[in-house]
């Protein structure tokens, strides 16, 4: 028979664990971990080229980083997105205003708009591309020397592997908890608590690795000064999951340890 205090601790711990799992799962699947807010470009730009380069172009960290900086990009663990004007030809100019130039980034920039009506802010559309698994494991290089950047490489790999480890541990602890209920044993609860404790550390490590990786990315490719950095709500969800998992771990560990002491005392009393 289980004391009401232990049962209450198990129920509360299970609810906290479920909330943490939902928050972390949503955070992993969304792209709003980090955002860049840039002012509206007042030049004529071929947005079709930018869209094709971002969506179907060759994977290059420097290229997609420049797009994130310029076009109000958002970055997640598995997604990168930009916001471009919703038009198929030229942005902020008419066909007669074009003056084609050869730019290194394959964009065609023209002189500032000279329309009598001025440049109205166009409607924008969000374009998102997911990171493939080989891209996640790709080696990061230093921009100037083209040497492997070990720090950024392993930070990037940890930032998407750690949440998967965290979710796997929570799922495994759920299986252990079900087995404990079927066996009517309180001992596996200690293992459940340890799994949640490690999962909480992995969740915190995810946030730290991601934030450090983004900081190094901005420094490596010299983010423009007019691009404002904003922390997205997805990162906050992942950060909230850390204390929830820790509280769940504390409840499970307390329940397992207290029940063991209580059971030992009852056994000793009966023997005496």
Identify the role of each PLM range.
Residues 2-36, 156-213, 241, 245-255:
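Signature of small four-pass
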Residues 34-157:
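A surface-exposed beta-alpha-beta supersecondary segment
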Residues 1-69, 93, 98-103, 107, ...:
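Intrinsically disordered terminal tails
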Residues 141, 145, 171-174, 260:
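N-proximal short alpha-helices
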Residues 203-236:
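Juxtamembrane loop segments immediately following a transmembrane helix
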Residues 82, 163, 238:
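Residues in well-ordered beta-strands of folded domains
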